[in-house]
Amino acid sequence: MFFKNEEEAFKRKPEIIIELEKEVKIKPVEEKVVPETKEEIEIPKPSEFRESKYNSTLTKNLFTNVDKARTRDGFGEALVKLGEINDKIVALGSDLAHSVRAMWFAQKFPERFFQIGIAEANMTGIAAGLARVGKIPFMSTFGVFITGRNWDQVRMSIAYPNMNVKLCASHTGVFSVGEDGASHQSLEDIALMRILPNMTVIVPCDKLETYKATFAAAEVKGPVYLRFGRENVPVITTEETPFEVGKAEIFRDGDDVTIIACGPLVYDALIASQKLEEEGIDARVINNHTVKPIDRDTILKAARETGLIVTAEEHQIHGGMGSAVAEVLIQSYPVPIKMVGVKDKFGESGSPDELQRAYQLTSNDIIKAVNEVMKKE
């Protein structure tokens, strides 16, 4: 049995739990708006800013006072908009709808939102059933729960029958749930999802791209894994920045080396390219938002034109986006490659900044990888 809203679910819970949840977690949807902050990023000022090297559709304040916003907000806003224009859109939550922003949809379309409770496998089966009768279900929870805890159900109920279900994962990677530690940090989810036949895997880089990716996921005929986070991250794209499933975007042109990144590390890759420019290294930066199906043409073109590849992701280096890039290269055009990512470790508790440094996921670590791969040339 499932509930159409959290209020109905409360009636089934012990009184003490109801009171605790009201105090700790459940907030009115009107409080959803999180003001975007402007924080100056400390980066070296380049001796010459060669604007022509950068994608003209990126924000103009890329390196000074860049706007920040939560990628999960882009998902929540897009889901509401989709609900307005398509009555086949339905949403399912597993007791974390407020945290992942699915509650915004629930507030506007309560009859099309299903609160399943802490039962991800049940949510998956229900979503598959809704898809079977023509609905377009968006099921959402934390990344570690929707993938690892729930993998067999996703495999058999969604991927195997090729159900048109969208798996929307918030609080992914190292940064989003830093203080919660290893149990909540989904560092293996890209690998788990991209190995499944029929599954599309999308990892947008900022709030605006997450908004576009949510719309794009609705257009894909089949299962989609959409990965986003909790923390404020720089908004580097604009409304004019193209987004197409399976088509990577070149954010900076360059001839010496290519940095291929996804998710929040796309911004760090751009910062690294600025610092490398001061060292006389001309780095191409590619936003590889679609891990599957991967854009083989753009990757191989970069390999042929620059001869060196560095990948950067907030995920295990084994089985993640870097592995997907390496698979393309080894089959068609092998070149030296270096991967920046979590190196076969579980997560730890700490602030996002502390963990980014501890797991060597900063722009300086990308620069180090570039220098190492250039020595192999």
Feature-to-residue mapping (PLM):
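Thiamine diphosphate
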Residues: M1-R227, N232, ...
